[in-house]
């Protein structure tokens, strides 16, 4: 694995950062602060890379507690780190170096043994983030929107300056993983997407937690259509196996979900 970061500058102080293991983080800069959205799997120094892009004081906001989104938090002990308290259990269990190394082993095999020294250590304490919390970065704000489903503590963030939505894993171009043991019932995810749509936010584009990025705002509608189709007929999906377990995969109108047919309704 090549331990390096890359970025795309989308203008207006928004940077998409690709980690060595390909997950996506985002840096959003105001006039007084910068917000780092997610810290990735914690391989290599994301902090050093971010400091090449901005010298503003940082805050870190995790879209949820999975290891490929909060695994690098240990580098940022000198700034506030926000994560929903509803994801603290999975953060504590899944963001240890040992758990993350095991995840990466599924990707690159025994090569992970050669890069163990590159894994960030430490699980710093986090501050809770609630629905509607506003992060003032100076002449721009990010507003937290809770979207429980993929995990109990998933959030999106709406940027009032560019009208982009930072979607984490809730709104990716690929499969939304709803088959995990700690994922909530599919109907909960559907309710989150319907609520998000009903907010009538003037979303221009969505920046997801995995490539490709960005995706179009109609991905919300596509995920809603897919979830409704599954709820109507839980057997429509085809079996899929991943490194994290197995589920059924359904795709409707370009929106796809990987789900557990036994976790459909509340």
Would you name each region that the model predicts?
Residues 36-39, 58-68, 81-85, 146-149, ...:
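Active-site neighborhood of phospho(di)ester-bond hydrolases with catalytic His/Asp-centered motifs
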Residues 143, 172-182:
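Surface-exposed cleft-lining segments at the edges of enzyme active sites
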């Amino acid at each position: 694995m090549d331990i390096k970061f890359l970025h795309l500058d989308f203008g207006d102080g928004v940077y998409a950062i690709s980690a060595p293991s390909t997950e996506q983080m985002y840096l959003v800069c105001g006039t007084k602060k910068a917000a780092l959205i997610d810290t990735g799997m914690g391989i290599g120094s994301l902090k050093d890379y971010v400091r090449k892009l901005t010298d503003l004081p940082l805050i870190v906001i995790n879209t949820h507690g999975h290891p490929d989104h909060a695994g690098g938090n240990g580098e940022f002990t000198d700034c506030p780190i926000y994560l929903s308290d509803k994801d603290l259990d999975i953060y504590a269990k899944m963001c240890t170096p040992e758990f993350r190394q095991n995840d990466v082993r599924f990707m690159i095999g025994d090569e992970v043994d050669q890069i163990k020294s590159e894994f960030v250590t430490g699980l710093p304490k986090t501050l809770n983030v609630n629905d509607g919390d506003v992060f003032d970065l100076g002449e721009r704000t990010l507003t937290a929107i809770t979207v429980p489903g993929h995990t109990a503590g998933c959030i999106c963030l709406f940027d009032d300056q560019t009208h982009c939505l930072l979607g984490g894993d809730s709104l990716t171009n690929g499969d939304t993983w709803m088959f995990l043991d700690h994922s909530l019932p599919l109907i909960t995810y559907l309710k989150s997407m319907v609520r998000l749509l009903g907010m009538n936010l003037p979303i221009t584009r969505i920046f997801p937690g995995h490539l490709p990025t960005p995706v179009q705002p109609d991905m919300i509608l596509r995920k809603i259509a897919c979830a409704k189709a599954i709820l109507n007929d839980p057997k429509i999906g085809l079996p899929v196996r991943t490194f994290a377990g197995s589920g059924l995969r359904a795709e409707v109108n370009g929106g796809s979900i990987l789900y557990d047919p036994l976790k459909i309704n509340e």
